[in-house]
Amino acid sequence: MAAAAVIEFQRAQEMLVSDRAASIDILQSIVKRDIQESDEEALRVKEQSILELGGLLAKTGQAAELGGLLKYVRPFLNSISKAKAARLVRSLLDLFLDMEAATGQEVELCLECIEWAKAEKRTFLRQALEARLVSLYFDTKRYQEALQLGSQLLRELKKMDDKALLVEVQLLESKTYHALSNLPKARAALTSARTTANAIYCPPKLQAALDMQSGIIHAAEEKDWKTAYSYFYEAFEGNDSIDSPKAITALKYMLLCKIMLNTPEDVQALVSGKLALRYAGRQTEALKCVAQASKNRSLANFEKALTDYKAELRDDPIISTHLAKLYDNLLEQNLIRVIEPFSRVQIDHISSLIKLPKPEVERKLSQMILDKKFHGILDQGEGVLIIFDEPPVDKTYEAALETIQNMSKVVDSLYNKAKKLT
């Protein structure tokens, strides 16, 4: 029995490249076969077949079949050791969730696996699955549920010795707080994660995720683009070394840093580099177009890039947030350049020069006046902008302070002399 299964398994592996469908059929027949619990070789082959079949179903995009496999193998898990069963469940669930197939069954399947782990009293497996559920809640923007389950899980993990899982949950907590714009708590959770990570060996995937989040926090909270760039570079190298699809995201954030540092000319050099060359495509092209628009101070090109590459730019919340700020700066620079020669100018004329709708130009000009970017008023009755000369700086306050300081020195000097005489 076991010998026949071994031969079939080997045949399935040989057919992986030439005929995947036939390979899947063979593996399914091995998985569905009933075996004796005492036959260790047959158990080993069935376990390998389940993992191989799961990998194949993930590669061929058969999400529903993979979800079905995860449910089907549960009775078999009682025949193998707890450690092997935990590895099998985690591997299959990770394969299913990493597909990002959006079947709508992800949370339900994850909850089913957690209930099974609870019923079987497998605490470590339950905690690992709950950490995956926190990640799933975060991905589906169910932030409150993610925080609630995450804080409950953190209390448990701090009493136990699974530091790698603790880092993972702390990192997810930081991401969730960042998504909710609670930057102080996001930074605190990240600091806790990095402190815990320093005490253990971090797998490349987890280390890359830590570096990525560190870069995001530095960019969001402190606008420290140089430090953020170095973190994104580490994250890119880490993800690239394990062929993770997140490498392209890290590369995009590196290019964003160069644009925000006002060195858009470095973007082309980065994209043409040896490491980044394999990631050439729409993702990098989008940032190249933004860099070119930023270099030329062209609002029209900037808006064209945002329209042409909507999925790559607007749908990424990190890039979208910072590009909105960049667009704002570009608009201000263009408006100041346009109004500079005038003391009184029609808003319609500014709108036609800058090729933007009049209400948007009006709104931005009024904001700039309030922020004291220039001195002027908007006469909406006549539809004109009146610009005043820069008022001379009143130095009375500075002169008064200087006089008081000098008087203080004189009084101190006289006091010291009088003290010596007495």
UniProtKB/Swiss-Prot annotation:
Q: Note the subunit structure.
A: Component of the 19S proteasome regulatory particle complex. The 26S proteasome consists of a 20S core particle (CP) and two 19S regulatory subunits (RP). The regulatory particle is made of a lid composed of 9 subunits including PSMD11, a base containing 6 ATPases and few additional components.
Q: What is this protein called?
A: 26S proteasome non-ATPase regulatory subunit 11
Membrane spanning residue stretches = none
Task: Supply the alphabetized keyword list.
Answer: Cytoplasm, Nucleus, Proteasome
Which protein family is named in the record? Belongs to the proteasome subunit S9 family.
Does Thylakoid show up as a keyword for this record?
no
| Gene Ontology cellular component annotations, sorted alphabetically | cytosol; nucleus; proteasome accessory complex
The record, for InterPro entries, names: 26S_Proteasome/COP9_Components, PCI_dom, Rpn6_C_helix, Rpn6_N, TPR-like_helical_dom_sf, WH_DNA-bd_sf
Which Gene3D superfamilies does this chain map to?
Answer: 1.25.40.570
Q: What is the lineage of its organism?
A: Eukaryota, Metazoa, Chordata, Craniata, Vertebrata
Question: Where does this chain mainly localize?
Answer: nucleus
Its annotated function is as follows: Component of the 26S proteasome, a multiprotein complex involved in the ATP-dependent degradation of ubiquitinated proteins. This complex plays a key role in the maintenance of protein homeostasis by removing misfolded or damaged proteins, which could impair cellular functions, and by removing proteins whose functions are no longer required. Therefore, the proteasome participates in numerous cellular processes, including cell cycle progression, apoptosis, or DNA damage repair. In the complex, PSMD11 is required for proteasome assembly.
One biological process term in Gene Ontology:
proteasome assembly
According to the entry, every stretch annotated as the PCI domain falls at 224-392
Q: Per UniProt, what is one Pfam family of this protein?
A: RPN6_N
- Supply the gene name: psmd11
- Localisation per UniProt entry: Nucleus; Cytoplasm, Cytosol
